[in-house]
Amino acid sequence: MSKRLIINADDFGLCRAQNYGIIEAFTQGVVSSTTAIVTSPAIEHAAWLAGRFPELPVGLHFMLSWGLPLTPLTCLVNEQGMLDKGIWQKSEAGTLDPEEIRCELASQYQRFITLFGKAPTHIDSHHHVHMLPTLYPLVEAFAMEHRLPLRIDRGEIARHGLSVHHTLSCDQFDARFYGEQLTRDTLLQLLDEADELGASSLEIMCHPSFIDLEMQGSSYCQPRLTELAILTDPALPPLIAKRGYRLANYREWPTES
């Protein structure tokens, strides 16, 4: 039986170049799903594109490290009322308010439904903040309550000594398709390593994008274009199939655990 491979494009809604890049990688390449930032500047454009491509599975990319939150979130915003990368320090200091985080997650979930007209296919987060030991239990509980699959980094689970109760997830998640030196072999190596671990399902994160003025302001810009080129390489699908994988998405997971 073939192994399931989810290649998920994060950051849907970040800017129009990102949105168009994800659509290109989905229709012309091997991206099999995406996750949307409902607080991002181009989210309405992303929702419009999703309406034009209803076969694209769209999940929620929970945001706690950039932009404006939907709720006051006083435990996390800076003096300008913005989210930033201070979440890691605040998590270590124990100053995060779980109820505030839960309310923000619920608000982003409801905004997703308003924008896309349906529930997300699954949940993950920007900068993987849901894997912080102070946040994982509450995000996992929310996903279970709503019967939504969840991106779970088993390495982070082991490193923090966390317990996993949610069964709707891939056996393995890999975030290493990222950086300045990406090649097609980089991606294929991740498949080979997951196979050696005996995983029957694997999720790989990616960020394929074109480049526009907004994207040029990102600290991770040019590599997104490289990702797009790799993920739309016509030689890639047979190499994936040769390794016993087929492209999948979280719509295939059962609706309850």
Language-model features and meaning:
Residues H127:
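Active-site histidine-anchored catalytic micro-motif
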Residues M63:
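Surface-exposed loop and adjacent secondary-structure segments within mature catalytic domains
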Residues S2-I6, R16-G59, G67-F116, H122, ...:
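Terminal accessory/targeting
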Residues A9-F12:
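DG-centered beta-turn motif at the end of beta-strands
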